[in-house]
């Protein structure tokens, strides 16, 4: 079952990315390194509700 999630930057707390994940394969919250347009660098982004 795939669900849509929002990724939030851990430094500036801006929600910039929408993606989907499979809850069966990834039951925990996802953490990805993505580019943050506000900080102009690659930062850690965490899944939000």
UniProtKB/Swiss-Prot annotation:
PROSITE patterns: RIBOSOMAL_L33. GO terms for biological process: translation. One of its GO terms (cellular component) is cytoplasm. Keywords: Ribonucleoprotein, Ribosomal protein. Gene3D superfamilies: Ribosomal protein L33. InterPro entries: Ribosomal_bL33, Ribosomal_bL33_CS, Ribosomal_bL33_sf, Ribosomal_zn-bd. GO terms for molecular function: structural constituent of ribosome. It comes from the Bacteria. It holds the Pfam family Ribosomal_L33. NCBIfam families: PRK00504.1, PRK00595.1, rpmG_bact. Belongs to the bacterial ribosomal protein bL33 family. This is Large ribosomal subunit protein bL33A.
